[in-house]
Amino acid sequence: MARINYSVKEDPETTSKAMGSELHISPKKSREVCCKIKGMKVPEARKFLEDVIALKQAVPFKRHHDGSGHRKGPMAAGRYPVSASKEILKILRNAESNAEYKGLEPANMYITHAAIQRGRVIRGFMPRARGRATPKDTETVNIEMILSEVR
């Protein structure tokens, strides 16, 4: 596996970082979730992700929204990406524990950077009738998150 670096440089004394590598979730859905939580305070983002997992709060889809219906609130199309939200919540909790280890207060921090990059594609084949096969590929995602103190 290749070494993955963070795409932005931040001050190490006032920030906390966490990363998830080659997660088996949809890149499109994880992009929409990361766009929504970027700029939120940490407790607010944690509550939002927990509500998405419980199907109480929808994530607005700006780019990949064909066939999505309108949802309550200030959004047009929205969905409930549960598996992507679970993985991003794990990364957020990891960044919170990294902040506590550094002596920072996670309740007073906000998400300055939440980005995804597509990871490698895991090739697979599903056998079909008469000796044929259909490709069944699994996409992976690399997610990076940086928390900063509120100034």
Swiss-Prot record:
GO molecular-function terms, A-Z: rRNA binding; structural constituent of ribosome
Gene3D superfamilies hit by this protein: Ribosomal protein L22/L17
Region (Disordered): 1-25
Keywords assigned by UniProt, alphabetized: Ribonucleoprotein, Ribosomal protein, RNA-binding, rRNA-binding
GO cellular component: cytosolic large ribosomal subunit
Domain of life: Archaea
Gene Ontology biological process: cytoplasmic translation
Keyword match rRNA-binding: yes
Any Pfam family the entry gives: Ribosomal_L22
HAMAP family per UniProt: Ribosomal_uL22_A (MF_01331_A)
Quaternary structure and partners: Part of the 50S ribosomal subunit.
Cited function: This protein binds specifically to 23S rRNA. It makes multiple contacts with different domains of the 23S rRNA in the assembled 50S subunit and ribosome. The globular domain of the protein is located near the polypeptide exit tunnel on the outside of the subunit, while an extended beta-hairpin is found that lines the wall of the exit tunnel in the center of the 70S ribosome.
Family note: Belongs to the universal ribosomal protein uL22 family.
Protein name: Large ribosomal subunit protein uL22
